[in-house]
From Swiss-Prot:
HAMAP family: AddB_type2 (MF_01453). It comes from Streptococcus thermophilus (strain ATCC BAA-250 / LMG 18311). Its EC number is 3.1.-.-. Despite having helicase-like domains, this subunit does not have helicase activity. Belongs to the helicase family. AddB/RexB type 2 subfamily. Its cofactor is Mg(2+). The gene is rexB. This is ATP-dependent helicase/deoxyribonuclease subunit B.
């Protein structure tokens, strides 16, 4: 064995390539061994350093792959299993064990994460040259017994099924020991690069090969100073020094310090020596120079997005300076959190990149198909799982319109469970759904699925056949082919990998579970676990790309230019964690009890020295320039600076704050025309009117010149920056169709309220007639209709029965009405809602019982008013009351709290009661002095705070809550005193005031009608204070944002509370005369129409949405 080491300023790969080349020239077969994660990069570098750029005698590979070269022709009839196959073996073993057989892990038998941990432990034991019997001295004897029982059963299963139960290195080890490879190995040289430690399995293999091979050359990085030091604990090179000394002591070899004629980057070498001296408590007569500050930079950026943008700009500048993409390497502290930002921003800057990380297949439609299939069976046909399956794009050749219809109906009827999906759908809403069509679609979707999922427990091979029949029935193969025909080349490659993984898993299921009796649940669980564990394997489309990978795999001299992102305390250094079934303490006790070349790794024990060595490798990763960057905010939280970056700052490396000044007049601040274009668009146009300082003016002068040239060249148009939400006038043909000019405009109080809430909301509901998703479950509309029906029956019952008997009779009759019986007997939740409604009816009825001064004139009065021949006001009055003096009043039942607020009325948000009074006035041909008021009756159970009300006042307070609230005519209040009426001064009006309210209400209708007829519907939700928006913003459609579009909101007129009623009445009175003139001047003649009392469906719904 030959041991070599060199400083990190030297290129060890170049030195070892020379060694490999010299042995190859002597006719030796050379295997250049690198760690698995670095073999691709090592192969590229070795080829670059070879004089002839290629060699048939040198193979760059890893330990496990090298073993395949020697044992490839060795007869091995046993079936090979990958990780998925091993997981199936453990699943099968645990399937036959009961909860009581495993005292510690009994409840985890079918947990996929636990099975994956078993697979990891199985592989780790192989790498440690151990068996499960070596797992002594665990914290619990029961835990040891469970693991021995599981692994012993798995081993028996592997032997019984003739599966290969040893690793490639174990098989290689066996062949070497047998002597079959002595001749081949005698002419073999191993060159080992990139290691600072061996696993126990690798360690044993190297020891054996040392006696058989012609030579083994091991190289690593460390300094002469560190290797010769007596005390290395805490040294930056501790990992490599310990590695070298262990090998030197074991094989009685003195390591050689080697160098090349090429001089590395002096700046990185000097910084390395300074850092080493800080950790070994020595002194060096060196300081950081200006050249060093240029070679190594430390950035601080606000957040990750800005950080990646700054790197992208620097890359574009390097390209402008003549550099290549392949000369640039981007390292990430946290791959997952940076992946999205890197992808989006690099594409914006036209930077091709290769992300050296396997990507999970979990988002592929086929994986979603299998996942949904398993969840449907496990959760008994849950609606969302079934819809995910049919919407995967791989389930049958159904049209998207049919699938949308099916999904809409399932959500409407709240279909859940196998029984409901197998039964005919019968629920309907006003015959809105074509049940014949939907049931035919249901049969096509559900029947092949249920035929497979309802299969009895049987052999795995039989279930596989039934699965294939099901997949063919739903056209999965043809749908996968169709998916690929429309895909890009990258997507086609992904589809091929997914299909290959799927078929491979099916083959392994056949192999392992072919003769095993399985339920459909277990069968699908095995498929799902296998598919979710699969990853895409990607290769760069071209060599000339920017490589992106995690930083802890870095080697010195990886690229001329290196950018390391996310170098915060949480990620630099990375702290390894033990997530296996064995704790660190248990591992330590096991290692103490075992002999040489048998060892379990204890990750937490090597964190410190591994972190130091990775940091030194990172600081020497670049040959020209290294940028270390840290964001202040990462993953939505603030993080501190890494201790290694603090050390660099202490040495004198300056901290550069990037992204602070967006208007620096430098070329690299423009970088790429797409970025410049997006920056221009993102700027708030209002800021362009401000006075610009000289620096900003210089920036824009350079930017605009560059942008104009590039845009003219590519014929690109900059879209106009619009910071408001505007609408387009509705086409005249549409308006004529919805609101014919020869007919009066239909409006209701609810429609008017909607209009003044937000004009665009009116457009959606009454022009486009969009509806919210319906549900078979009762909601506020159904609750209100139910209570209306109860009180109609009570008030219309003229029999001699007592009031309470009438009420109970009305409740019973209403419950038996077919619509309510269907609604309120669907499930326990619906029945509970009905109980609550019955309680509300009984509570509210107490108000109706004792009201001798008032007689119910009529109920459910439909009205149809024609206003100046141009507006038809429609609606339904719940109840009309008559006083003993003949005055009429209106009662509107409400399930929620409503009061008459004159401020809201003035602003168009509460016109209902006044509109109903207008209907009374015109329907009964009475004057304002013959009306006594309009009021709401809240149908609810009073809710009282018992901590604030004594028991003696409880009944009185509850009775007080059940009162009529609205607006009343002052002259009629003497007839109402003593009744259940809230007669506050703020809600009582004299005859003249009532006339003013009625006239102003007409103005509200006329103003709304004028805008509606114009076809211009603004997005103008109302605001009360000008700071927040209370109106319906309909954000998902309008994209209205209060902070950006407040100027378009309709601000309500608000007056001080003191004298508010009188002030609003005065404002209304000012417009009274003008309104009368407009009515007389703008009267339009219409053909005589049927004035029969009728109302369209939407207005009926409006008046019952309480």
């Amino acid at each position: 064995m030959k041991l070599l080491y060199t400083d990190m300023s030297q290129d060890l790969t170049e030195i070892l390539t020379e060694q490999a080349s010299s042995y190859a020239q002597k006719g030796k077969r050379v295997f250049y061994i690198a760690p698995s994660a670095l073999s691709f990069e090592k192969e590229r570098k070795v080829l670059e350093y070879l004089p002839q750029s290629a060699s048939f005698d040198i193979t760059v590979t890893r330990f496990t792959q090298m073993a395949r070269y020697f044992i490839l022709n060795t007869s091995n009839p046993k079936t090979q299993l990958d990780d998925t196959g091993l997981a199936m073996i453990f699943y099968k073993v645990l399937l036959h064990m009961g909860d009581d057989e495993l005292k510690v892990y009994g409840r985890l038998r079918k947990d996929s994460n636990f099975i994956n941990q078993l697979v990891d432990l199985y592989k780790e034991l192989q790498q440690a040259n151990m068996t499960v019997l070596d797992l002594q001295h665990l914290d619990q004897v029961e835990k040891q017994e469970d693991l021995v029982r599981i692994f012993s059963a798995a081993q028996d299963l592997l032997l019984a099924g003739d599966f290969d139960n040893q690793s490639k290195l174990s098989a290689f080890f066996k062949e070497i020991t047998s002597g079959h490879l002595d001749e081949a190995l005698s002419n073999t040289v191993l060159v080992i690069d990139g290691f600072t430690r061996f696993s126990a399995e690798e360690e044993a293999l190297v020891a054996l090969l040392n006696d058989k091979c012609h030579q083994i050359v091991v190289g690593t990085y460390t300094s002469q100073k560190a290797y010769k030091a007596n005390f290395v604990y805490g040294n930056v090179y501790q990992a490599s020094v310990d590695f070298l000394r262990t090998l030197a002591q074991t094989y009685k070899v003195i390591p050689d310090y080697v160098t090349t004629d090429k001089e590395g980057n002096l700046s990185f070498a000097r910084i390395s020596r300074l850092l080493e001296s800080r950790h070994d408590f020595s002194t060096v007569d060196e300081t950081v120079t200006e050249q060093d500050k240029h070679a190594l930079k430390v950035w601080e950026v606000v957040n990750q997005k800005e950080e990646v943008a700054q790197v992208a700009k620097s890359i574009r500048q390097l390209l402008a300076d003549g550099k290549r993409y392949k000369d640039i390497l981007v390292l990430l502290g946290d791959e997952e959190s940076y992946k999205l930002h890197v992808g989006q921003i690099f594409r914006k800057f036209d930077i091709p990149y290769y992300f050296g990380k396997e990507e999970s297949m979990s988002s592929h439609p086929l994986v979603e198909f299998v996942d949904s299939l398993e969840r449907i069976k496990r959760y008994n046909y849950r609606a969302e799982d079934l819809l995910n399956l049919v919407k995967s794009g791989l389930y049958g050749g159904f049209a998207q319109e049919d699938l949308d219809l099916f999904e809409y109906y399932v959500n409407f009827a709240d279909i859940k469970g196998r029984h409901k999906f197998l039964s005919d759908f019968t629920a309907n809403s006003r015959d809105k759904y074509n049940l014949d069509q939907i049931n035919a679609l249901r049969s096509q979707l559900i029947e092949p699925l249920d035929k497979f999922l309802n299969s009895r427990k049987q052999k795995g091979s039989s279930l596989l056949k039934k699965l294939v029949v099901f997949l063919e029935a739903v056209q999965l193969p043809s749908q996968m082919f169709e998916l690929s025909t429309k895909a890009s080349e990258a997507e086609k490659e992904q589809n091929e990998q997914v299909w290959k993984a799927f078929t491979h898993i099916l083959e392994q299921v056949e192999t392992i579970f072919g003769d095993e009796s399985l339920s459909v649940d277990d069968f699908l669980s095995i498929l799902r676990s296998g598919m979710l564990a699969c990853d895409y394997r990607t290769v760069p489309a071209t060599v000339d790309v920017v490589n992106v990978k995690k930083y802890d795999l870095i080697q010195p001299h990886s690229a001329p230019y290196v950018f390391a992102l996310g170098m915060t305390q949480s990620h630099f250094p990375k702290v390894g964690q033990n997530k296996s079934l064995l704790s660190d303490e248990e591992r330590s006790r096991i290692n103490e009890a075992t002999d040489e070349h048998r060892r379990l790794d204890i990750v937490t024990q090597i964190n410190s020295k591994r972190g130091h060595f990775v940091a030194m490798s990172l600081f020497n990763a670049a040959s020209e320039q290294l940028v270390l960057s840290q964001p202040q905010i990462i993953n939505e939280s603030q993080d501190d600076m890494s201790v290694y970056l603090k050390e660099l700052l202490d040495l004198g490396i300056p901290l550069v704050e990037k992204g602070r000044n967006r208007f620096e007049a430098k070329g690299d601040q423009i970088g790429n025309y797409r970025d410049l274009l997006s920056t221009v668009i993102a700027l708030n146009s209002s800021h362009l009117d401000l006075d610009l300082d000289k620096e900003t003016q210089t920036f824009w002068s350079v930017a605009v010149r560059y942008l104009r040239k590039r845009l003219d060249k590519d014929q690109v148009l900059i879209p106009k920056v619009i910071d408001d939400v505007t609408t387009t006038k509705v086409d005249d043909q549409v308006m004529q169709l919805v609101f014919p000019e020869e007919e009066p405009l239909k409006l209701s109080a609810t429609a008017l309220t909607t209009f003044y809430n937000n004009q665009y909301l009116y457009f959606l509901r009454y022009v486009l007639e969009l509806e919210e998703l319906e549900s078979i479950h009762p909601d506020a509309r159904h609750h209100g209709t139910y209570l209306h029906r109860v009180f109609e029956r009570v008030m219309g019952d003229s029999s001699s029965e007592s009031f309470d008997d009438k009420l109970e009779k009305a409740i019973a009759q209403t419950n038996q009405d077919q619509p309510f019986e269907i609604l309120y007997t669907e499930d326990q939740e619906s029945r509970f809602s009905r109980q609550i409604l019955e309680d509300i009816a009984r509570s509210t009825a107490s108000v109706l019982r004792d009201n001798a001064a008032v007689k119910v004139e009529c109920e459910e009065v439909k009205f149809d008013l024609l206003l100046a021949n141009s507006i038809k006001i429609t609606g339904i009055i719940d109840r009309v009351d008559r006083l003993t003096d003949g005055a009429l009043g209106v009662v509107d039942y409400k399930t929620g709290k409503n009061v008459f607020d004159i401020q809201k009325f003035y602003n168009g948000l509460s016109p209902q009661l006044v509109t109903y009074l207008e209907a009374l006035r015109q329907t009964y041909k009475v004057d304002a002095d013959q009306l006594f008021g309009a009021m709401y009756l809240h149908m609810q159970v009073p809710q009282l705070n018992l901590s604030q009300i004594g028991l003696e006042k409880l009944a009185a307070q509850a009775h007080k809550e059940l009162t009529y609230k609205g607006l009343f005519v002052a002259s009629e209040t003497e007839h109402l005193t003593g009744g259940n009426y809230d007669l506050q001064k703020t809600v009582t009006y004299d005859k003249e005031d009532l006339e003013t309210l009625l006239d102003y209400n007409i103005k509200l209708f006329r103003s709304a009608a004028e805008v509606i007829r114009s076809g211009n519907f603004a997005i103008n939700p109302y605001t009360e204070d000008g700071k927040s928006v209370q109106g319906d913003q309909i954000k998902s459609i309008t994209h209205f944002e209060a902070d950006r579009h407040m100027g378009q909101a309709r601000k309500l007129l608000r007056l001080p509370k003191k004298g508010k009623k009188e002030a609003y009445l005065e404002l209304m009175a000012k417009t009274e005369e003008e309104n009368q003139m407009q009515v007389s001047e703008n009267t339009i003649s219409f053909p005589v129409i049927d004035h029969a009392v009728r109302v369209d469906k939407k207005d009926q719904e409006d008046n019952h949405v309480d």
